[in-house]
Regions:
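RNA pseudouridine synthases
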Residues: 1-302
Length: 302
């Protein structure tokens, strides 16, 4: 079994990462397995204290622990596009993209295992089958899913080279002065609060374009385009310029009078090259219920 480390797991100790994946296995058992060379990173034996880096590969035999396989769950999927190699799904707000920590049910991966159990890439490991990129739990919208590893690599390369275009809608706090612009600030993990990302000197290059669509008394409706894809990128960038995403309590917005499942943010547009062809696919979706309710309220008060 192999797990590809994503940015969200970077800076975790090796023993902590493995313990979080397998809640029924004690930390001591995990540490013993690491010490005895049963758990490796990139094919090499490491200490339990080894700090993981993005794209590290954590490797061990399937039978090292009594691992319970993920359940395939009959969760409705809103599929916006599908061909023989991939699909694009519209993830609702409130749903995890893939299992994390003790949460191993009700995720998009659980739903995908029911929809196409034998047709999902496994580059990211058993818990991230098919997942090419992710959305935060309370961000809704479009996600690409790969049915095989070649397609997974093809789509990830488009994200890496910035040829895949991902656009979002957000309502942000405050009235933005500029009609459009670019935020180019490096992002890294907040070492005091591992749930947060921050603007960090020496962090990863992070670029977000924004365009104002509508202004209200205390909020602004914006379109955002990711040029890079860091964890919480839009949320961190907008907070850094004094306009946190509405209801994003983690990044300083507080909860407004219009209560929602946290941040008012959705991935509404996705443009990419169809795998192994020259055909350009563009998919756009309408406002989700959260955004509709917020915009209706703000327009009624304007």
């Amino acid at each position: 079994m192999e797990y590809l480390i994503e940015e969200t797991d970077e800076h975790k100790r090796l023993d902590k990462f493995v313990s979080e994946m397998f809640e029924d296995v004690s930390r001591n058992t995990v540490q013993d397995a690491i010490k005895n060379g049963l758990i490796k990173v990139n094919g090499n034996i490491k200490k339990s204290s080894y700090v993981l880096k993005e794209l590290d590969k954590v490797q061990f035999d399937d039978d090292i622990f009594e691992i319970k396989p993920l359940n395939a769950e009959r969760i409705p999927l809103q599929i916006e596009y599908e061909d023989e190699n991939m699909l694009v799904v519209n993830k609702p707000s409130g749903m995890l993209t893939h299992p994390a920590g003790k949460e191993k049910t009700g995720t998009l991966v659980n739903a995908l295992l029911n929809y196409c159990p034998d047709m999902l890439s496994d580059i990211g490991g058993e818990f991230r089958k098919g997942i090419v990129h992710r959305l935060d739990r309370n961000t809704s919208g479009l996600l690409m899913v790969a049915k095989n590893n070649k397609t997974h690599e093809f789509l990830q390369e488009q994200i890496k080279t910035k040829t895949a275009i991902r656009k979002y809608y957000a309502v942000v706090k405050g009235i933005m002065d500029s009609d459009n612009g670019t935020i180019n600030k490096p992002i890294g993990r907040n070492l005091k609060n591992p749930q947060r990302m921050d603007i960090v000197e020496g962090g990863r290059e992070s670029i977000t374009n924004f365009k104002v669509l509508e202004r209200f008394k205390e909020y602004t409706f914006v379109e955002l385009e990711l040029k890079t894809g860091r964890t919480h990128q839009i949320r961190v960038h907008m907070s850094s310029i004094g306009h946190p995403v509405m209801n994003d309590t983690l990044y300083g917005a507080g909860m407004s009078k219009v209560h929602t499942q946290e941040q008012v943010l959705m991935a509404y547009s996705l443009t990419f090259t169809k795998p192994f062809s020259d055909e350009i696919i563009n998919i756009q979706i309408d406002y989700d219920e959260k955004l509709k309710r917020v915009l209706n309220y703000l327009r009624s008060k304007n």
